[in-house]
Amino acid sequence: TFAGLVLLFVVCYASESEEKEFPKEMLSSIFAVDNDFKQEERDCAGYMRECKEKLCCSGYVRSSRWKWCVLPAPWRR
C-alpha cells in the first residue's frame, strides 16, 4: 500500500505541475503574434507583446510574471 501512495503522490504532483503551466501556455497562444500579419516592424514592443529582446514602447512596462508589455499600475511594481 505504501508503493501505491507514493505512486498516487507522483501522479498528483505531475498533474499539478502541468496545471500551473497551462495558464501561461494558453495566454501565450492567445496573444501570439504571427509575423505574416505584422503591418510594420517596430523597435519596441506594444501592449501584450512579448518583450524578450525588444524594449516596451513608451507608456508600457514589462510584466515580471508574463514577460509581456503591459500598462503600468500601482500593483505592478
From Swiss-Prot:
Can you tell me where the transmembrane regions are? none
Q: Where in the cell? A: Secreted
One GO MF term, please?
ion channel inhibitor activity
As given in the record, the signal peptide range reads 1-14
Task: Tell me the disulfide pairings in this chain.
Answer: C44-C57, C56-C69
State where it is primarily located: secreted
Record's keyword annotation contains Phosphoprotein: no
Matching entries from InterPro entries are given as: Huwentoxin-1
**GO CC, any one term:** extracellular region
Cleaved propeptide residues = 15-42
Q: Give the matching Pfam families.
A: Toxin_12
Keywords associated with the record: Disulfide bond, Ion channel impairing toxin, Knottin, Secreted, Signal, Toxin
Q: In which tissues is it expressed?
A: Expressed by the venom gland.
Tell me if Transferase is a UniProt keyword of this record: no
Quoted from the entry, the domain comment is: The presence of a 'disulfide through disulfide knot' structurally defines this protein as a knottin.
Indicate the family of this protein. Belongs to the neurotoxin 10 (Hwtx-1) family. 51 (Hntx-8) subfamily. Hntx-8 sub-subfamily.
What does the protein in this record do? Ion channel inhibitor.
Protein name per the record: U3-theraphotoxin-Hhn1k
Write down the species. Answer: Cyriopagopus hainanus
Phylogenetic lineage = Eukaryota, Metazoa, Ecdysozoa, Arthropoda, Chelicerata
